[in-house]
Regions:
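Accessory terminal helices/loops
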Residues: 1-113, 117-135
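Structural scaffold elements adjacent to functional motifs in cytosolic proteins
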Residues: 72-73, 174-176
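Short glycine-rich anion-binding loops that position phosphate/pyrophosphate groups of nucleotides
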Residues: 77, 179-182
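Short loop/helix-cap segments at secondary-structure boundaries that form the rim of catalytic
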Residues: 80-86, 183-189, 206
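Helix-loop module immediately N-terminal to the HCX5R catalytic loop
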Residues: 92-111, 190-212
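Short beta-strand/turn micro-motifs composed of small residues
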Residues: 115-116, 176-178
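A short glycine-rich beta-strand->turn/loop micro-motif centered on a GG-aromatic cluster
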Residues: 133-147
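Tandem CBS (Bateman) regulatory domains
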Residues: 143-146, 153-159
Length: 213
């Protein structure tokens, strides 16, 4: 190992630490908040379910959204892209749900309404509560299908092929939201790096008057 393992080579303490920590992102913003909350104590999971498992009508959900409540869509990525409630956030239950919630939802006391696949509402509430987000006020009754059937406005996230991207992407208006190590390994020329985990902290670097890919 001393002959082949770089970590056991002739490194100073400073060189060793630098070698092991290069490229490592800071801890997600919710870590410190969750640690502080751990000292105070959380609501029991039974209390969380009692306050969160409230079926809400479309009108109740939209009224809450207008008052600053986050509508969180937890369906599959493709389903969200094909159609979702305007201004809804997306974090899919089928991926790393809890870590992404912790990285992207800055306020741990943010009131939330869940839009989930039928039968997945309680799972979403439980997984949010596990990382400290226990202020879910309800879920949309009937899910997105009920909303779509109501005829109300929907939003979509269009996707394009690499060929379409190459032909039409405006120079300097490409956002790369991967991790710095992935960006450094290979990226689209002139793409702007804004790692998704910390996008909230750098929104002032995005020109809101321009379209981005």
């Amino acid at each position: 190992q001393k002959q082949t393992n770089y970590a056991l080579g002739n490194l100073t303490k400073e060189e060793f630490v630098k070698e092991l920590t290069t490229g490592i992102l800071p801890a997600p913003q919710y870590f410190a908040k969750a640690a502080a909350q751990n000292k105070k104590g959380y609501k029991s999971i039974d209390d969380v379910f009692e306050s969160s498992m409230n079926a809400m009508s479309i009108e109740q959900m939209l009224e809450a959204q207008n008052k600053g409540v986050m509508v969180l869509d937890t369906r599959k990525e493709g389903e969200f892209s094909d159609g979702h409630i305007p201004n809804a956030w997306y974090i899919g239950l089928h991926g790393q749900f809890a870590p992404w919630a912790g990285a992207l939802i800055v306020d741990m006391h943010q009131p939330i309404v869940i839009v989930a696949e039928e039968g997945k509402e309680q799972e979403a509430i439980m997984r949010l509560a596990r990382v400290g987000y226990d202020n879910v006020i309800g879920y949309l009754e009937g899910g997105y299908a009920a909303y779509a059937a109501s005829g109300k406005a929907v939003s979509v996230v269009p996707s394009i092929t690499p060929e379409e991207f190459k032909a039409n992407a405006p120079e300097g208006q490409v956002l790369d939201v991967r991790k710095p190590s992935e960006y450094d390994n290979c990226h689209i020329e002139n793409a702007q790096l804004l790692t998704l985990d910390y996008l909230n902290e750098h929104l002032d670097e995005v020109n809101k008057d321009k379209p981005y890919v």
